[in-house]
Regions:
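Bacterial N-terminal signal peptides
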Residues: 2-11
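Boundary/junction segments of secreted and surface-exposed precursor proteins
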Residues: 13-37
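PGST-rich, cysteine-poor low-complexity/disordered linker and tail segments that act as flexible spacers
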Residues: 17-20, 40, 50, 71, ...
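Short beta-strands within extracellular/lumenal beta-sheet-rich domains
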Residues: 42-54
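Extended extracellular/luminal ectodomain segments enriched in beta-structured repeat modules
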Residues: 55-62
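Aromatic- and Gly/Pro-enriched, solvent-exposed loop/edge beta-strand patches characteristic
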Residues: 69-160
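A short, hydrophobic C-terminal helix/tail in secreted or cell-surface proteins
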Residues: 187-206
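Short, charged juxtamembrane terminal tails flanking transmembrane helices
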Residues: 209-212
Length: 212
């Protein structure tokens, strides 16, 4: 029975959320030697955005960005998922919160991977095109959003007005490094009941064979 319960635990653990979109390479690789600024008004006041597409509806659990901090303050980045408005970011759909601290960009890895969590109904997205928008509200903080694996190209947008909703300049440039993860599926109560009942039956049969 212990073996069967172990199988149940393993099967649940394996039901992790899917990768919905990524510009990272094998082993979450990215270009840590180049990137675009995400900074406050005492620098360039740059807001940087990358487009992504969902082939079907999904719930976002988090986004992972490759970010590094330039010398100065190290205020958290605010990350948004925005609608697509004719090839540039549109209205804010969801707000994601930074988890942890951004490492120095000059550490030999361009900083590192930083997780931004999404929670609530806002994270349920329909199929379609969206934008991931990184905004730094602290005037004295400058972050660098590293480039994607092998500097692959895609739709990227910028503005130097410090506004997460534009106006935008957009083009087909080297993308930034990021990944969007889906939420883990939650089994229906009925499915869990059937599974557990099946395990109990299998365990009873095994016990009978061992005692025979």
């Amino acid at each position: 029975m212990a073996i069967l319960m172990g199988a149940l635990i393993c099967s649940v653990s394996a039901a992790a959320g899917d990768i919905l979109y990524t510009t990272l390479g094998p082993g979450s690789a990215y270009d840590g030697t180049n990137g675009y600024f995400v900074d406050g008004s005492n620098y360039y006041d740059t807001v940087t955005a990358d487009s992504f597409t969902l082939g079907s509806g999904a719930t976002v659990a988090n986004a992972v960005l490759a970010l590094g901090n330039s010398p100065g303050n190290n205020n958290p980045v605010t990350l948004y998922i925005e609608s697509n408005n004719g090839g540039v970011p549109g209205s804010i759909t969801a707000t994601l919160s930074q988890v942890g601290t951004i490492l120095p960009w000059g550490n030999g890895s361009g900083g590192g991977l930083v997780t931004f969590s999404c929670s609530g109904a806002q994270c349920a997205l329909a199929a379609g095109s969206y934008w991931l928008v990184a905004w730094e509200q602290d005037p004295n903080t400058q972050q660098v959003w590293d480039l994607a694996y092998q500097d692959q190209s895609g739709n990227v947008a910028f503005n130097s007005s410090g506004s997460p909703t534009g106006p935008w300049m957009a083009g087909f440039y080297s993308e930034n490094a990021f990944q969007i993860d889906g939420a883990s599926p939650i089994p229906e109560p009925g499915a869990l009941l059937v599974l557990f009942s099946g395990l109990l039956s299998a365990g009873y049969g095994l016990r009978r064979r061992l005692l025979a």
